Structures are given as structure tokens and as C-alpha cells.
């Protein structure tokens, strides 16, 4: 099927697929390895990986050590499959238990095992072996792996993940200790005096892992009974996810580098080691925050689980102190946000507002906070890989042309703008990877770079850069003024609303006084009318000749 699809794409002797089939590795090493060779969007690297062709990869590297850059070894086809996915499919279909080729792709070529395909599959590490093509016996070797789809994690793989994380943490802590001792022996001794050693860090990690079942049981009951606030960490699979993320973070820093970066491995180890405590503390905070919000007092029981036992899981004073501080910080941040919002919306009348008005303000602020995640004005997510490649272009320009950093940055921006002007579609941020491919062609050698710069009008580029900066500043100023105007209008509306309320009360009081006055006048007039009628009635009872009228008798007034 693959051969049929490639017929329409491979009609040249210099085509990557033909070069590969003819084993012309010298020419293939300097060809475009990202070129599609079939209708499924596969590249020749996909085919080599599917064939588990270790020799082909090695032969290409001999002719061009930088042939398999990150965007080459991690090019996706139409189903979002990377070459490493194709290699994994071959291994699984053949039942081959030896996955050394996958280790080679990750550790030797920089394949990223954490990128999911269209089916959501990633490459996970579960069984330890050892492989590092640049230093097979070194202490910084990445543990080898048996690779399974991420949805195939079971109880056994959880245990293996736990063991793997503990080993990784110990290796990283040891590397960090060695680096600190080289940089500052005094600092290293100070840490040891405080009990910060690879052994203590490893024991702390084991303590967390050993308590996982109890923590899972606790949060499983919390979710089932719907007690208190729903935590961000619920259910029994969260320790699996945490361990997978930590392992992936470790393997990404290890495996996401090309062969030329192997000498810098200790630097990345040191980075991970420095952030290890932060990762573990954040993990502890999630649980401790939930204990505080759902457990109540320390001796309060939830079902058959005592929260005092949970709170005693981490007995180290420093850990408890960090957890308490982190809880206060987390809660304080939320409280500060609410207070700040309430102050902005009701700054002139905090003491006069009733509870219902505050509730309305709180709901409005909650809605605004939720809209932060769906607003189209929020900044786009940064592509860190693209940013790294952009930064690497500066060094490459400096090396090829021998210019300083500022000039190199100007040349890089000029080439980037020129490519965008020639192809407006490449200006869009979602096409950054395509733009990088075009730029890499220019940076291939000194001659191609110099030719590209000679065709660019630098004065025009500088003018355009200045114009873009001015437009960007103008947009920011307009947005700022718009926000200020909206806030001013809201304050004015609230002020008018309060004024209308006061006027309404005053009007009601005046109306009430007027009504009472009118009622009093009406009462007086009615009484007067009654008296008048009484007088009239008395006069009407005097008949002709001064006789008083009665119902039955007429009495004369004369003597």
C-alpha cells in the first residue's frame, strides 16, 4: 500500500525515497528529509523508522551529523504520527520485546515520545534498560524503556513508574549535588549540614509513593460522598498521571536533544534537580489544600478515615511548614483577587452596600474570571520549541558571518520579515514551523545566507520594524484607554444608581408627607361638612308657624 501511494511522489532520481531505496546515503543526508513521499504525509524518515533501519540512520549521520534536527525526526504525517510511532507499530505487530531501536530514536536522535498522534497515543516508559549511544557506560544514561500506549497503564506499570521516578530523582539529586560542589563547595557543605542529601531526597520521594494508596482511598471517598469542595486531584489514577508527567518531564529534557547536545547533559540534569523539590511540594500542596477545605478539624472523621492520619503523612517539619505556607498563599491569592475585584467595582460604598449587592458583585467577578479562559483576546500559547530554534538562528548567523549578537538579531528579523512579505500565510503564528523550515534553508551555509541578505533592503526592513512597533504600542494604548473608559463608565453607572436610590427614598418620604397632609385636610373638611349638615337638619325640623316637626307629634312653640 505504501509503494502504491509513493509512486506519484517519487518520480525523480534525487527524490528522498529513491535515494533511500538505492542506499545513496551521502545524497540523502543533504536532501530535504521533511519532504512528503506519499499521500498519507509520511516522510522518508517515517519509512526508515517503520523499517527499523538503524544502519540507514547511522549512515546519514556519518555524512551529515545535523541531518536529524528536531523538526525532521519529529515531523508528523496526516494522522499526526511521528516516525517513533511508526517504529512502535512495527515492534508491537512483530511482538519484538527488544525496544533498543526506540531508545536509539529518543536518546540518539532526539525523538519526542510525549507527542500524541491523532488517536491520543504517546510512548510511555515502563521497563528499565540502559542505552546511550554517546556514553554507553556513563552515569547520566537515560533508563531504557519498553513502550506501551498511554492508555495501557495497569497496576504493574504503576509500580514500575513509581520505581522509575524514585531512581530518576536519586540520579538527578546526585547530579545536582556534584554540580553544586563544583560551583560552590561551601554551599554544598551547608546543604549537607541541613540534611539535604541524595539519600534524604530519595527517602522523601519513597514516602510520597508509599502513601499513594492511602491518599487515593481518601480522595475516592471524598468524591463518592461529595464532601466539601471538589479538589483538583480526585480519583485513583492521579498518582499515575503525576508520575507519568514527572517521568515525561525527565525524559523530554534527556531525549529531546540532538546528538550534538550530549555534552550539555549535566546542565539539564542540574535544572531538573533544582526544580525537583518544587515539583514535589506542588504535589503535596494539592493534597494539603484539599485536607484543609474538606477535612475540617484534624480529629474530624470522614467515614472510616481519620484526617489526622492523612495530615501526619508528611511528618517532616519543613514539609509541613512549606505546605502550610503554600496553602495560605493559595487561599490568599484567591481572597486577594476577590477583594481587589470588589474594591474596583464598589470602591466608594463598601460600608454601605448590603449583602445582596456584594453577592451580585461576587457572581459578576466569578463570571469574568471564567471568561478569562475563553476570551479571544488572551495571548496565544507559546511554542517553546519554535522559540528555541529562533534563538539558535542568532548563534548560527554569528558563526557564519562573524557578526555581533545585535547585528545577528537584526539579520534574523530581516529574513523573517522578508519571508512573511513574500508569503503572507507564513505570518500567522500557527504556521511558525513552516516559516522555520524556510529559514533553515537560508541558514544552511554562509553563501545562501549572504545571498539572502544581499536581496533584502535593510532600510526598508528597519522602517517596517519601526512601523510595527508603533502600531503595537498604539494598539496597547487604545486597549488601555478603552479599559479605563469602561471602568469610568461603570463607576458613573454605580454612582447614578446610588443617587437614584437616594432620590427615590426622598421622593417617597415627600409623597408620604403630602398624603398625610391631604388626609388631614380631608378629615377637617368632612367634619365641617358634618357640622353643617347637622345645622341644616336642625333648621329643617322647624316647620311653618314655628312648629317643631316630629315623626308623630307637632308641638307648637307658642305659649
Curated annotation (Swiss-Prot):
Key words, A-Z: Coiled coil, Virion
Q: Where is the composition biased (Basic and acidic residues)?
A: 454-501
Residue numbers spanned by region Disordered: 315-360, 454-559
Stretches of Low complexity bias are at 507-527
- The annotated regions of Polar residues compositional bias extend over 320-329
Keyword Coiled coil found: yes
What are the Acidic residues biased-composition ranges? 348-357
- Record's Gene Ontology CC terms? virion component
The protein depicted here goes by the name: Uncharacterized protein L488
Provide the taxonomic classification. Viruses, Varidnaviria, Bamfordvirae, Nucleocytoviricota, Megaviricetes
